[in-house]
Amino acid sequence: MHNNTLPAAKSGEEPIPTTTATSTKPSSKLPLRPKKLLADSPSPPRILVIGAGSRGTAYAGAIATHTAATIVAVAEPVAFKRREFVRAYMDDSSGDGDGDDGSGDGQRGFAGWREWVAWERGRRAGGKAASVDAAFVCVLDEQHREVVQGLAPLGLAVMCEKPLATTLADCVAIYEAMLRGGGAAPQVFSIGHVLRYSPHNMLLRRLVGGIFRTVTGNWRRESTTAPSLLTKSCHDIDFLLWMLSEPAKEGGKAHKPAFLSSTGKLNFYRKARKPAAAGAATNCLSCPIERDCMFSAKKIYGERHLRNGNAKWPVKIVNPEIEDCLSTMGLDAAENMLLKDLSEDWTSDTPSEEVRRRPWFGRCVWEADNDVCDDQCVTITWEDDAASGSLAKTAQFHMVAFTEKICERRGRIYGTKGEIEYDSATIKLHDFATGHTETFYPEQPGGGHGGGDDGLATQFVQAVGAVKDGRMGVEEAQKRFIGCTLEEVVQSHAMVFAAEDARKQRAVVDWPSWWQKNVEERLPPKA
């Protein structure tokens, strides 16, 4: 039996959670935190959460559990979700008592982010100081640009859920807004790339960067839905760049990719694959083979979740009011609400704009207007770089829709001195020189993304606190706690769009020139 502990991080390196490598799985019990982060701060950060859905509540739970920061406001259009959020995550002292936003929550609950911005501007116009220090943006992906642009002039630190935006133009617009500050000084910025912050991946990065030079690696990301590289795997691409491009030590030079390529297509969810027995049915509720179909929306949302008392994700995605309906009116009423929503469908007379605008959760998977890949490969290549002292390497990423391992990640990394194989629970390191294989069992703290949700939220709050207390400047706090710059956030998203260009054009993309043309040259000149 081998029981080896990793050495402590050297000066300038990221701290790594205490993790033991052993041939037997360690106890799942975790040590209790002695006190909340920033408990000694004279003025812990005050937080605004925009969007009280799954992501907003995940981050709020981490903030409330692990930090001394205070959530003082929430902007959420669904009244039930807003009330529940206030009750769960905001104490009675939240808010400052000047007026009421009309929701019955004082200054704590707002029907939308614009309402909060208007209220905040009114306060400041009256000579009052800012009411919050930072905002978590957890709204729909396509709304990220307008929210971040609306917040930038207020000088708040921002944590935006991934993806940053749904188009390259919107990503560049967010980049410009936060870079230039909308007239305010630049602030700490983070993105919901939670894979960077789990104990598992922090250990994996240390093993990759500290034990051997990487030659090539294969990564797989698997999902049960028809995914896209942007919405489902932008943080996987970020994970690869974090693992293989960004320097492990402060002051080190990043090893930038040289070029990339991609192949992929929609293989399964096409009309040609539709079972003949389904006939002309376009909606699950009117389909003659609904009971035998593994993709039945009625079974997935209703029987598998709602009937078991779960009105949260994914059921509430169909209708955000279902949670309130279930708790106040009971299961029968909630099921009727769900079935009504699932029965909605479009016809040849439905305007194309309405078809694109609505999600149509009950639509037959083979009759939908889905055009995103359910199987895609991306190859990223680095060349020798004398400036950073890095050798050439290659990363191959495979995103697939069908797998037993739902939303889990597996990978194999080949280096000059050994290789690493990992899944969500273990990391195996094989040493070529000794022939010995060690198995590491990283800490499993629970919560979303292997502890990544909690890790991201607490690191962001610590960065905001360090700047607020005057212990660090924005740039230092950004690197120390967030671990990446605003530019690096945008680069990982831009690489997704570059990969899509490569796939559609059946071409190899030169990364430096693509970045210069599609991002740098789109930024407005400095005033």
Question: Which residues does each predicted region cover?
Answer:
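Beta-strand-loop-alpha-helix segment that lines the small-molecule cofactor/substrate pocket
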Residues: 134, 140, 145-196
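Short aromatic-enriched loop/helix-cap "lid" or pocket-rim segments at secondary-structure transitions
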Residues: 85-87, 172, 201-203, 214-222, ...
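Short amphipathic alpha-helix with an adjacent loop that forms part of the alpha/beta core around
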Residues: 113-132
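Predominantly a Rossmann-like dinucleotide-binding segment in NAD(P)-dependent oxidoreductases
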Residues: 184-187, 194-355, 506
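NAD(P)-dinucleotide binding in Rossmann-like oxidoreductases
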Residues: 271, 276-455
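N-terminal Rossmann-like dinucleotide-binding module
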Residues: 2-96, 100-102, 240
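Conserved acidic residues
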Residues: 72, 107, 133
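C-terminal helix-rich "cap/oligomerization" subdomain common to oxidoreductases
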Residues: 2-19, 23-40, 136, 360-362, ...
